[in-house]
A protein has these predicted regions:
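N-terminal helicase ATP-binding lobe
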Residues: 1-295
Length: 295
């Protein structure tokens, strides 16, 4: 099953697309590839499943904590199924700086949250770029890290960098240098994006590009309406799922106080980690149930 994408995807009730089968084959070797595919085409599974099927450690790196939160549930489900089918425990680590958690999945279907110090000893590690850089290359006084030389070749490790088009300025420079370091060290990695300018591709050390074929997909029109009174605009869209974006946290907080009630949520980068996650979960539940809300 390690070399059979059809059989491995079937474990989760899925069927691989031609693009996912191609990535599965490329990942057999020593990939240093760019995967270009639109949102919703299964990039996550395309990159992750080859590592899970072959028993490699997967380090999945995202630009933001919210994207890590979004993927956590999916990987918990996958590892729980694998632990039961393979008859051996699996582990997931979530490391975002604000939150460090380790989940152990037993063959009997049990799930246990633990606080072990050796965070990166797991089958799947979900983290952000800034935290990965800190953990692997943190040589400041008092935070010396030997994770990179000690762990990077412990097992066959595959690094996956998703949504890389979101990196800008300093973050992009740091990312580019990290990719160069991994490439020169012979470490396996995949870089994923929905889109990437040619100039950006040229800056990365890559073996090749796998591009998802263009497909006709349903389109959604987003109307940008910066003018007008926010309260009036909101009232005219009652009963719908509405995202209200303001320039400053103070403005958003004041508007939230005026509207506070059922289905009204405030979300911004200064929220405490626990509150941010609670808001995110509630909004996701309403989205799934297609219930109205105001964010």
């Amino acid at each position: 099953k390690a070399d059979d994408p059809e059989a491995f995807y079937a474990r989760f009730g899925l069927k691989p697309t031609p693009f996912q089968r191609e990535v599965f084959k490329v990942a057999e070797g020593d990939p240093a590839h760019l995967l270009l595919a639109p949102t919703g085409t299964g990039k996550t599974e395309a990159a992750a499943f080859p590592a899970l099927a072959r028993g490699a450690r997967l380090v999945f790196v995202l630009p933001t904590r919210s994207l890590v939160d979004d993927l956590e549930g999916r990987f918990r489900r996958y590892l729980k199924i694998l632990a039961q089918e393979e008859g051996r425990p699996k582990a997931l680590v979530v490391d975002t700086g604000h939150r460090q958690a380790r989940f152990r999945f037993s063959p009997d279907g049990q799930e246990e949250a633990t606080k072990e110090r050796h965070l990166y000893h797991a089958d799947v590690i979900l983290t952000t770029l800034d935290k990965l850089l800190y953990r692997y290359f943190g040589y400041a006084e008092g935070v010396k890290s030997y994770t990179f030389p000690r762990r990077i070749h412990d097992r066959r490790t595959l690094f996956v960098f998703d949504e890389v088009h979101l990196y800008e300025a300093t973050a992009w420079v740091n990312f580019r240098h990290l990719i160069a370091s991994l490439y020169k060290a012979g470490v396996r990695f995949l870089v994923m994006s929905a889109t990437m300018p040619g100039t950006y591709r040229e800056e990365l050390l890559l073996e090749g590009t796998l591009e998802h074929p263009a497909a006709k997909r349903p389109s959604r029109v987003l109307r940008y309406m910066p003018q007008g009174n926010p309260m009036e605009i909101i009232q005219s869209h009652r009963g719908k799922r509405v995202l209200v974006v303001l320039e400053e946290v103070k403005e958003a907080a004041e508007l939230y106080k005026r509207l506070k009630g059922e289905g009204v949520f405030l979300y911004h980068g200064r929220l405490a980690e626990g509150q941010r996650r609670r808001v995110f979960r509630k909004v996701k539940r309403r989205d799934k149930a297609q219930k109205p809300y105001l964010l």
